Each structure stands twice: as structure tokens, then as C-alpha cells.
Amino acid sequence: MSIMDHSPTTGVVTVIVILIAIAALGALILGCWCYLRLQRISQSEDEESIVGDGETKEPFLLVQYSAKGPCVERKAKLMTANSPEVHG
């Protein structure tokens, strides 16, 4: 019995399968990391919209992702509520 009983392409296929598995695992980890980072960024933006420096921002999810599409009435109400008042 010699060491070279199997064909040489078996080793190449094994290496390719291992590389694909590593790449898939890396993509999964990268995707989770990006998702968590975006969640953290959107959470800080939501906090800024509640407690801003004098000017409140529109909540991103409220305006763009409602169940029936963009809610124009709610957006208009927010725009008029956030308009700067003139002090004289």
C-alpha cells in the first residue's frame, strides 16, 4: 500500500471546500458585526431625536417604515411641531 492510493484531485477539492467554508464563516461573522453596528448607530440616532441639542430630529423608522408606507400626515405633523419659533 502506498500513500498515493487516492487521486491527486481529492486533496485539491478538499482544500477548496475548506476555503469556501472559511469564507462563508467569515462572511457570516462580518454580516453579524455590520448588523450589530448598524443597530447601535440607529439606537444612538433615536436617542438624539429624543434628547437633542435644541433641535429634534424625525424618528427614522416612524417616517419611512410604517405598515402602510410613508406616513405623510404624521411626517407633516412632526415638521410643524419641530419648526423654529420666532421670538420677538
From Swiss-Prot:
It is a single-pass membrane protein. Residues 32-88 are cytoplasmic. Keywords: Membrane, Mitochondrion, Mitochondrion outer membrane, Phosphoprotein, Transmembrane, Transmembrane helix. The modification Phosphoserine is found at residues 49, 83. Residues 1-10 are mitochondrial intermembrane. It is found in: Mitochondrion outer membrane. Induction: By trimethyltin (TMT), a trialkyltin compound which is a potent neurotoxic agent that selectively damages specific brain regions. Gene3D superfamilies: membrane protein stannin. The keyword Transcription does not apply. High level of expression in spleen, followed by brain and kidney. One of its GO terms (cellular component) is mitochondrial outer membrane. The chain crosses the membrane at residues 11-31. GO terms for molecular function: metal ion binding. InterPro entries: SNN_cytoplasm, SNN_linker, SNN_transmemb, Stannin, Stannin_sf. Monomer. Belongs to the stannin family. Plays a role in the toxic effects of organotins. Plays a role in endosomal maturation. This is Stannin.
